[in-house]
Design a protein with these regions (language model features):
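Conserved glycine-rich FAD pyrophosphate-binding loop
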Residues: 1-150
Length: 150
């Protein structure tokens, strides 16, 4: 028997978690390098490493579950800073984030910046055509209604 996300209470208190899952090429040397850099950031921010790798035919996803106590303000601050450092590290290597917490959707969407954010501009045009009043999930995945700055 398992209890989904029961490990979120790892630190005690009201447990929380934030996922971080960059996608990289399926190469062992890159996976080892990713592990070393990510593990070092966990250590730097005083967090317990809780991650794995999921392999596909043409990709490798480094699935991280950042566990914390929601009532510990010091810990929540470290988690935020660590998450931002993880995103910056992955961006610097050209790795995109698989999915992200709603709090970080704008941050992650900003990393997809090829051709002056061509993907964001396309998504915004599609959103404007399908949802001109911006009522369906405004801001989801960093896609905001027309007239609202990204």
């Amino acid at each position: 028997m398992s209890f989904p996300l029961a490990n979120a209470n790892w630190h005690g208190g009201r447990g929380g978690h934030v996922g971080f899952s960059p996608v990289l090429p399926p190469r062992g040397d890159l996976a080892l390098d990713q592990f070393k850099r990510t593990f070092a950031l966990y250590r730097q921010y005083g967090m317990d490493y809780h991650a794995s790798f999921a392999m596909g035919e043409r990709h490798l996803t480094n699935v991280n579950q950042i566990l914390y106590d929601k009532d510990d303000t010091d810990m929540t601050g470290r988690v935020d800073a660590m998450f931002r450092a993880l995103v910056a590290d992955s961006r610097a290597r050209g790795y995109g984030e698989y999915r992200t917490h709603i709090e970080y959707m704008d941050l992650v969407a900003g990393t997809y910046d090829f051709n002056d954010h061509a993907l964001r501009r396309l998504n915004q045009k599609v959103k404007a055509a399908l949802d001109p009043n911006g009522v369906v999930a405004p801001g989801k995945s960093g896609i905001w209604p027309k007239g609202r700055p990204a």
